Amino acid sequence: LGVGRGGRVTRLSLPARLEGCYLGVSDLGLDGDIPGFCAEALLHEAKKQNMRGIFADIEADSPAARALLGPLDRLMHEAGLPLFVPLRQAGAVEHALLVAETAISGGSLDGYFEELQRQYPGRIAATLRPVSADFRLPAQDSEGHPLTEKERRALQHTCGAQAFFSRELCAKYFTYMDERQNGHFVLYDDRSTLEAKLRRLDALGVKHIFALYPDVAALL
């Protein structure tokens, strides 16, 4: 389902009828006054379709988002159904599970999730999002320049760079110098690193892990 301006709920098409899954809720321009029955409608739909819970994939930190997620959090908790929201919505909910991304470019994957679990005991889930980015050194941000797999392979071949595994980031990387002698750091995931991340998360006790199909097709 999608939720737009004024809490309008729109049914998005799926290739097949699904039961026993999680109901996904997308942000379709969520804005304005959000009536109380909007959260009730989402819970009703989850029950009607025999869903296991709801994943409200709403990233915006806005009054409208909080007006929807707060009541939805309460209703889902009372109904005994899990609600998942992005980590950045932690301040808008009291009971929902918080979904953190595995695509990090600094620090330690284990340390990151261990700290989150200390902050929110029993409430941390994960989304397995492969990283593939080129960072010019010194890095100016945590996102870098995104690369497709084809672009990354071509770049590595052209530079003749050797790839290494970072235990801290649980990802592979290589470095190279561009034509202006600027240093670059390319960080990426492949099947082996995604499998390693799943093992790490399992060892850390993270029980709920989400992923988009195209991102993890190699694992299936």
Segments (PLM) and residue ranges:
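Extracytoplasmic/secreted proteins, especially bacterial periplasmic and envelope-associated proteins
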Residues: 37, 41, 67-71, 108-111, ...
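Acidic/aromatic/glycine-rich contiguous surface patches that form carbohydrate-binding/processing clefts
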Residues: 197-220
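Active-site region of glycoside hydrolase catalytic domains
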Residues: 66-67, 74, 81, 111-138
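Short acidic, glycine/proline-enriched helix-loop-strand junctions
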Residues: 64-82, 163-174, 178, 218-220
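Conserved, mostly hydrophobic/aromatic
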Residues: 56, 126, 201
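Glycan-binding loop/region signatures in secreted carbohydrate-active enzymes
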Residues: 123-197
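Chitinase-like catalytic core of GlcNAc-active glycosidases
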Residues: 1-108
